[in-house]
């Protein structure tokens, strides 16, 4: 068991866990004032390193479903750390331009239409770690955010109030 290792055995612990199928971990490196300062930087973009899984396959990290609703709900609506316009720009056009994705991030003729229709007043992230001391990445069942009514990928509606439409217009 993990708790049986002494602090001096950290390298052995990591090697042993990898040999037994690997592991995942959550590290908290920033406190709230740091997060808010970073968000307000004119050079800061908003993104997530949360891993995604298909519903029913494994347990995704809560950030996979909660990052953007958290920013809009907590830091825009509740705490006024960013304006709605700044937050949306930091999530869409700014990263798209920075990474050279010229057909993404803006609504304009000739660009791909990736659109999220949300109600800021109802927007709430619901993703959690259900058992943080046992299996830190457990997020089963998938807990999608509240307040997102429609999602369009490449101009095709994929999410509506009733759920996924079955359309898969995205590509890699």
Task: Indicate where each model-derived feature is located.
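His/Asp/Glu-enriched, well-ordered alpha-helical/loop segment
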Residues: 1-20, 33-124
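Cofactor-binding beta-sheet edge motifs in enzyme active sites
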Residues: 67-69, 168-171
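C-terminal cap of metal-dependent C-N hydrolases
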Residues: 37-43, 48-51, 117-169
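The substrate-binding groove and active-site-proximal loops of carbohydrate-active enzymes
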Residues: 25
């Amino acid at each position: 068991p993990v708790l049986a290792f002494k602090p001096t055995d950290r390298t052995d612990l990591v090697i042993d866990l990898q040999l037994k199928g690997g592991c995942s971990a959550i590290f908290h490196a920033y406190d709230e004032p740091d997060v808010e300062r970073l968000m307000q930087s004119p050079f800061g973009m908003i993104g997530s390193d949360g891993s995604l899984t298909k519903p029913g396959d494994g347990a995704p990290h809560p950030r996979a479903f909660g990052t953007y609703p958290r920013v809009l709900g907590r830091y825009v609506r509740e705490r006024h750390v960013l304006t709605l316009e700044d937050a949306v720009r930091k999530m869409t056009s700014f990263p798209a331009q920075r990474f050279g994705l010229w057909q993404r991030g803006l609504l304009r003729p000739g660009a791909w239409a990736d659109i999220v229709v949300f109600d800021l007043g109802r927007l709430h992230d619901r993703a959690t770690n259900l058992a943080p001391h046992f299996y830190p990445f457990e997020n089963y069942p998938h807990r999608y955010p509240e307040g997102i009514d429609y999602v369009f990928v490449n101009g095709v509606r994929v999410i509506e109030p009733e759920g996924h439409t079955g359309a898969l217009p995205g590509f890699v």
